[in-house]
């Protein structure tokens, strides 16, 4: 994976965006070789689509999945559901986070154009 001003984790407020000039130059040198974009979390959709058009075939968004999981789990606990019945059971406690990750992945698959592809 090449560095095109992408980072792992959350992007700072003053992030200027991806360097498409660099990505284009890399694509010219690598030809049809699929490229990977690390640090895909938080990159605007238009930039993601442009990166795909320039040869990016895999985009890592683990931080976004982790943030979705944490937010859903936090909401469950803040609502006091862990104190109701057997809501403390890890299978129940973690279920909202798991569902949130699934929703995030489905959303990203749509954006990346990978739905229906093996």
Which residues does each predicted region cover?
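Glycine/Thr-rich beta-alpha phosphate-binding loop at enzyme active sites
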Residues: 1-21
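Short, electropositive alpha-helical surface patch
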Residues: 19-25, 52-60
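Glycine-rich phosphate-binding active-site loops on the catalytic face of alpha/beta enzymes
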Residues: 4-9, 54-70
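Alpha-helix-loop-beta-strand connector modules within alpha/beta enzyme cores
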Residues: 14-37
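Short, well-ordered coil/turn segments that N-cap beta-strands
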Residues: 31-34, 57, 85
């Amino acid at each position: 994976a090449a560095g095109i001003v992408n980072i792992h984790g959350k992007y700072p407020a003053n992030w200027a965006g991806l360097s498409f000039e660099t990505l284009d130059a890399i694509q010219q040198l690598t030809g049809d070789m699929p490229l990977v974009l690390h640090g895909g979390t938080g990159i605007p959709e238009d930039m993601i689509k442009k990166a795909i058009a320039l040869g990016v075939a895999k985009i890592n968004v683990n931080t976004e999945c982790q943030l979705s999981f944490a937010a859903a789990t936090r909401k469950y606990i803040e609502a006091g559901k862990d104190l109701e019945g057997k809501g403390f059971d890890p299978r129940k406690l973690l279920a909202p986070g798991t569902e949130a990750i699934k929703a995030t992945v489905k959303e990203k698959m749509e954006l990346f154009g990978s739905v229906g592809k093996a």
